[in-house]
Amino acid sequence: MILRYLDEALEGERLRRSDPYEHAVESMLIAKEGPITMAGYVYVMNQDKTQRETLNEKLLSLYRDINNFLMEHSPEGTFLFESFGLAEAVFTPVFKRFWFLDYYEGFELPVGSDYARVKKWRAACMAHDATNQVTEEEIVKLYYDYALGAGNGALVDGRKVSSFAFQPSWEKRPMPPRDKYETTASDEDLGLFVMDITFNAEDRNPIYVSPNSG
């Protein structure tokens, strides 16, 4: 809904298809975003190893469904239509967040006709110049707590800092451990630390001091 509003409100070429039939087609594809997003988040937050195969198959079934849709409406194309459009703008952030599944669950789309078309589409979406705001390293580091079952900024037991903390920046942190089922990294392991807050006696401006600053 927000993307549709921005597409209509901002200046520039519209992503939304102007042809009523084509807009209906892209809307049908966009409607598939919710279920696949939910399946991906349930998968990455899962803490029960016995459920991995079930969750993996659930996500694969949704990819197969999108593959079938693309084969019906754009079997030879790269995008749904001739260029990156509204459907691609909706799905690309999801595909990029799913880097956390590649890293923490070893997820990958199988080789074969059931996935070939959606793999082509996904790769084109993620390679588009307009989608380079985030990197795989950033997603993997920020979403570590999700991989341990703690979403929306919740703290993992025994931790004092969320992996979504702004400081220290993700670029300065080490990569988290891949094995989320057997290993739980500490704040120190993740390059996170609690900031002690003191105040300047004259102007009361806060001064942030790292415990390791001496």
Descriptions of predicted regions:
Residues F81-E105, D114-K119, C125:
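GST superfamily/GST-like fold recognition
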Residues S113-L155:
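A contiguous, mid-protein "functional segment" used to position or interact
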Residues R16, E108-V111:
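Membrane interface segments of multi-pass transport proteins and intramembrane proteases
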Residues L29-K32, Y43, T92, E137, ...:
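Short acidic/histidine-centered micro-motifs embedded in hydrophobic/aromatic stretches
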Residues L6, F98-W99, T135:
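Activation segment
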Residues M45, F107-E108:
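Short glycine-enriched, charge-decorated loop/helix-capping segments at active-site entrances
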Residues M1-S83, K119, A150-G214:
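GST-like domain detector, emphasizing the conserved glutathione-binding G-site
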